[in-house]
Swiss-Prot record:
The organism's taxonomic lineage, starting at the top: Eukaryota, Metazoa, Ecdysozoa, Arthropoda, Crustacea
Protein name: Hemocyanin subunit II
Record's function text: Hemocyanins are copper-containing oxygen carriers occurring freely dissolved in the hemolymph of many mollusks and arthropods.
Source organism of this protein record: Panulirus japonicus (Japanese spiny lobster)
GO MF annotation terms: oxygen carrier activity
Principal cellular location given in the protein's record: secreted
Length: 20
């Protein structure tokens, strides 16, 4: 699922930003 993949990637980016 392309949409789910895109959402998961965005969530990873958010998690990385919050991790700092």
């Amino acid at each position: 699922d392309v949409v789910a993949s895109s959402t998961a990637h965005k969530q990873q980016d958010i998690n990385h930003l919050l991790d700092k």
